[in-house]
Each structure stands twice: as structure tokens, then as C-alpha cells.
Amino acid sequence: MNERDTGRQILTDLMGAPYLDQRDEQRNAFNAPLQDYSDEVCFGRVWGRDGIDKKLRSILNLAILTALNRPAQLKHHLQGALNNGCTPEEIQEILLHTAVYCGLPAAGEAFKVAEGVLRERGLIPVDSSEPTGPGARVDAS
């Protein structure tokens, strides 16, 4: 399998076949070089490496995309993180950790995006108002 095919398989495993199908439908002469770069380099060469597992790569992406305040890409990578074995509690802790290092505005936006994804997937109740996860309450003292 070449790097492009490897990348497309990893992308399918990460985001799901419907995501890749939609992306392929939007392919045109202008964006084709970027899609090829993404398939071959990002997913084929980097995500395809053995040094760290896919779950850890997803965790890194959640933190990086939160720091960069990229909600659209974060939404896709939240789906990928769940597909790679991250739990809602782990995602909550990852995003809470980013608040300290990236700031509350970036983390707040990430929490909104994550909450939407988790609700869409039925992983948190639509009407939940109680804190969840380890410790549930963060004590600022």
C-alpha cells in the first residue's frame, strides 16, 4: 500500500467513511494538492508511524487544536479521538488541562464543541447539568 492509500485508510478509521466520501465529493483542481498532502504526509507518513499509538495522537490533536482555537477541525478530531478509544471523561480532562496552558477562552470554545459532539453521540445526556468526571468539581484553591 502506498502512502496515499495508507493515509486514506487511517483517515477512514479515524473520521469514518462518510467524512472521507464528503471530502472526496468536494475535491476539485484547486484543493486537490492540499488533500493529497493531507492524505500522504499527515495521515500516510505521520499518523502511519509506529512511535505512538493513535489514541495518543488524537489526544495531542485535541490539545493542539484547542490551543490554536480551531473549532471546526476540533469537532472532527473529537470524533476521531472517540473512535480511537478516548472516553468522555478523558476528553473533559484534556480540555480542562488546556485551560491552564492555553487560556479559558480557547478551552471554553473547545468545551462547547466537545459537548456538542458528545451529545450527538449520546455520550452525555441532553439535559445534564451536574458536573461529570473524576473529582467533578475543580477547586481553584
Annotated model-derived regions:
Residues 54-59, 88-94:
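Alpha-helical scaffolds flanking conserved acidic
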Residues 100-101, 118:
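Short Asp/Glu-rich motifs
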Residues 104-108:
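Substrate/cofactor-recognition hotspot
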